[in-house]
């Protein structure tokens, strides 16, 4: 018996440990994706695995991206794992209304009682929305539902539950939802959340998501994949015949795998590079012997070696394949530039030597389809709600589709395991392996009205928060200090043209509650003088600062007609900003100047140029100058990079949806927050 590991390889029972199997199921899906990519010669793919409770996404470009730490239940484990991002959005994600917004998840209906359509008094879930819209067909599901487990999906109960929710929402908001438009609204919200997760493993790491093929699998993904591709601008989608059980397919394709790591932590030099060769041999030899003792042929055993490298003074290393010294060094620099946006400016150190040994197994061969068959005839037809209308679409059984068959959407394809919806702007082709390849006819722009509605309100809430989250990812990756990189003592947020807080990532509350005053102080001090490419620095507690070590970088965002439209800011705790004691938190200070340097409206970047000399003078021209200037400079540059990320992403939103729509929804989100707080206070008064 062989067991799957989070790293994407198999091991025996004696070698298996719990921490190495935490993500073994999703890892199987990733390995399945790699098999699909290689057989179709795709350059880069995004794995989109949507199941019942969550969605897992991954990326593959010929190399498996791995991490050395896995998180589960809030606990971090040091374990080699494939790089997989997860979002709580699946078929069981609960649908709700908070009085102003439609909500999808993160709670799940689970398998019992499950969604309303299971007939067990469950709550409305995403599966119910797909059923109402016709994206799944009850006649093709087994009769295993209801109390006696012999009933079909309960379509009437689902419609009744949606009818009740629709009436509640229309009464509360003055909207005019129909059953279909309400269900579609919930789907739109879920699709945006899943698309945002895909951005985390692509755009946030420097990869253009539009240059990838979307490999969709899991029971629910084929109903959503066209919408996800449209949101992200992805042109090509592939659905494997085993798409709903691709994790099992991947595990069947996985290889026996062993790995070993040795910590080194020394400067990367020609000498340390040569020393790593002997370390690699000492690590690999016992792993190869172990596989040979299991009966693996030595000809089928291969090894890969990697070095974990990092810039001196930083914590998180980047893993690069072992190669010639100069080639490997350039590879590290290229990855660093792609992820962080700049070249490493300090010395590089070798942290770990890694070895992976794999016994290549025979992969499952996808059967070739026979093209010498009659053209398929639609099994039946059904109605699906698409693009605001109900339209009739043909249903084809997957087994009837021959190699080379093509058809323009819309249509539905059903097999024993899943249902695929091909939307009108996609064309279908069946390749020789029976893989369903869909291509988007032209990249469509998703449009929204500037009028407030509960669906768009939640979508833009997630979009704005997603921008702040991407800023946080950039800041954590580029920072040098332990405070920001490891303790995560930072916050990122978006503000309207008046400096009012609009959206933030789930960062430090004390930062987020005060940052708006800092932004407003910058606005007041620079009214009519700010230009594109200007970034400002402030930490003054009398102007919204929390305490002096918390430095805030603020930048304006201008629209196409050079009108100041938004502000973006990041706040980070610096290890030292001067003062009478290291750390800038003296317990017996009598005046704020003894805590450190007060910064008020300092132009840190002018016209896109970092004012390093002026910044150093600011930090040193004091009775109690700042310590460790190099770290201060690098952390401020990281904050600037994060703010710049926010500016770029906001500009992308404006380009995609229009300036009027984006600014309107910034206003609506603030209105919604005020209304929600008012309702909460009224409820508190009534109850207490």
Question: Which role fits each region the language model picked out?
Answer:
Residues 5, 20-27, 49, 77-79, ...:
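Active-site nucleophile and cofactor-binding loops and adjacent substrate-binding regions
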Residues 42, 52, 105, 109-113, ...:
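C-terminal, non-catalytic interaction/recognition modules in large multi-subunit enzymes and RNPs
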Residues 3-9, 167-171:
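Active-site-adjacent bridging/hinge elements
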Residues 25, 62-63, 99, 313, ...:
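Residue-level detection of beta-strand-connecting loop/turn positions
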Residues 8-45, 67-82, 92, 197-206, ...:
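Conserved phosphate-binding catalytic cores of ATP/NTP-utilizing and phosphoryl-transfer enzymes
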Residues 44-47, 54-104, 113-115, 240, ...:
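Glycine/threonine-rich beta-strand-loop-alpha-helix active-site module
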Residues 1-7, 61-71, 98-104, 187-200, ...:
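A short, flexible low-complexity segment enriched in Lys/Arg and Gly/Pro that occurs
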Residues 19-20, 63-66, 254-258:
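Short, hinge-like loop/turn segments at secondary-structure boundaries
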